């Protein structure tokens, strides 16, 4: 299907699959000296050309909003293609390097931390534009996972995730596409994409997910970054965050923190898991962390109660002396 779409738009060069996310299939096309990234967004809800056009307009509006706040992101050429009973969006952009997840995962400590610093330089552009001077909520949203940042040959970092287009449309933030069906799902998505506290928490857990062995250094870097903003909301949140207490807590306090975990404590759960793996790398490897992240995955609503129950069992077992 991808090759058929590429032929339809006249891009039938050498095709290489790139890591794809939830919303799009992504390929790199090379032909006659140029390289283009092609993202194909195929959604069942795009049944009419009007719905596809509205989504394309939102992506363009988000791109412009990012440029307005100084975020470096590649230009996009958007095409709408008929595909059976629905319409697909095809987004063509210049190749700006591979995403930095593998660089963080396999690089030296210096390479890893330098890469994170470059990510934070982009995140800073978002944080410098809150909805008001004393708010932790931002004008533009983002998904700060390392998969959404690329490093080009000149060493320039780019933010490349324009789908969903996380900007404020008619006074309401677009957090996902399609939007979560429950208020709890919307609120969680808003917190992780439009609130500086949630964005830093997502970045913290995602980075430590990849490099739990460098967790102390990563936390130090993020703490220094957050202190650069005169925002009491941000400071107070992490001062009171139970994940910080867990680091230095004794066995009984750690047990109490785990027992109190609820279905909205997704990022606290993930944070605790990466701390446990950092302390006990021989017993709790990346596979164990991935199990926890999988059990805490959510979209329309908070994770199921049985998932939280299983997580608490796993974390409680991890606290037992070895």
Q: Predicted segments — roles?
A:
Residues 135-209:
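Catalytic activation segment of kinase domains across protein kinase-like and atypical kinase folds
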Residues 1-13:
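Juxta-kinase regulatory segment immediately upstream of eukaryotic protein kinase catalytic domains
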Residues 64, 70-121:
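Conserved structural core of kinase catalytic domains
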